[in-house]
């Protein structure tokens, strides 16, 4: 039987935003700024280029000279409540799973990317002709949904299981999808990369691919304790053995049918 270790959960207040404000260009930029712990300049400018798909523009990021000289990547790090879901409507496709991250902290790269993209559209510069008809005043912005970013491009990503005082375990995410989808929501870090700027009418968003997921090796559950406080309960006794055997995981078939949403999602690009 798995050993249970109880830990008090200490949470810090997180920025919140209304659904309406997150659907405006100014609102999503301000929200991304509010969850950034730094305002250090990272991006010099962004260029959107036409692609083979009419609704998509490729994204080219020019970092500042100091970062470029250090061969810094354009990856973006996020932290937040993370859950991998099965996509019931697409089990026979490569995007049979997707990641939902309720972001609580983000690299300044995120807000500067949004700021640069919508600045380009406002000033009609560094964008393809297909975007010249857009106005930042009338755009419905969809990068965030319910303060979360959805990522269904997982191919080639790595997952790193970490535990204090122990060596981490690094694996390809392809072999971990099933077990990860059975985990409870957990605080995790994700390294993502922007793929395209997507437009459907006046709805727009930036889509991302996952490069790496960094998550606690322990399988945990948040429960209400006898005192009424939330407690973080470890569900594993031997993390490495349980990880290998997929023990200590939630048994329910936690699936999410994106087609059941009233609003048709546009994060599958």
From Swiss-Prot:
Its main location: host cell. It comes from the Viruses. GO terms for molecular function: single-stranded DNA binding. GO terms for biological process: chromosome condensation. Keywords: DNA condensation, DNA-binding, Early protein, Host cytoplasm. InterPro entries: Poxvirus_I3_ssDNA-bd. It holds the Pfam family Pox_I3. GO terms for cellular component: host cell cytoplasm. Disulfide bonds: none annotated. It is found in: Host cytoplasm. Induction: Expressed in the early phase of the viral replicative cycle. Belongs to the orthopoxvirus OPG079 family. This protein is synthesized in the early as well as at the intermediate time of infection. Plays an essential role in viral DNA replication. Binds to ssDNA with high affinity and localizes to cytoplasmic factories where nascent viral genomes accumulate. May disrupt loops, hairpins and other secondary structures present on ssDNA to reduce and eliminate pausing of viral DNA polymerase at specific sites during elongation. Homoomultimer (Potential). Interacts with the small subunit of ribonucleotide reductase. Interacts with host FAM111A; this interaction protomtes OPG079 degradation through autophagy. This is Protein OPG079. The gene is OPG079.
């Amino acid at each position: 039987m798995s050993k249970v270790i109880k830990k008090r959960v200490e949470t810090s207040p997180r920025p919140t935003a209304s659904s309406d404000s997150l659907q405006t260009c100014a609102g999503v930029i301000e929200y991304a700024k509010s969850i950034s712990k730094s305002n250090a300049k990272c991006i010099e400018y962004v260029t959107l280029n036409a692609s083979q798909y009419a609704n998509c523009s490729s994204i080219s990021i020019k970092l500042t000279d100091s970062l470029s000289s250090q061969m810094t990547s354009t990856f973006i790090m996020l932290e937040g409540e993370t859950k991998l879901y099965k996509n019931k409507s697409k089990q026979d496709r490569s995007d049979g799973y997707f990641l939902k991250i309720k972001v609580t902290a983000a690299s300044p790269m995120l807000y500067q990317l949004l700021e640069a993209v919508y600045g380009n559209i406002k000033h009609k510069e560094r964008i393809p002709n297909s975007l010249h008809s857009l106005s930042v005043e009338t755009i419905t912005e969809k990068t965030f949904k319910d303060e979360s970013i959805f990522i269904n491009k997982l191919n080639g990503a790595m997952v790193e299981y970490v535990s204090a005082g122990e060596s981490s375990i690094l694996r390809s995410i392809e072999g971990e999808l099933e077990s990860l989808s059975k985990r409870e929501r957990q605080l995790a870090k994700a390294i993502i990369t922007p793929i395209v700027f997507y437009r459907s009418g006046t709805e727009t968003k930036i889509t991302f691919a996952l490069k790496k997921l960094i998550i606690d090796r322990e399988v945990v559950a948040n429960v209400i304790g006898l005192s009424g406080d939330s407690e973080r309960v470890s569900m594993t006794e031997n993390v490495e053995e349980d990880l290998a055997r997929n023990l200590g995981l939630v048994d329910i078939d936690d699936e999410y049918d994106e087609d059941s949403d009233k609003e048709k999602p546009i994060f599958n690009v």
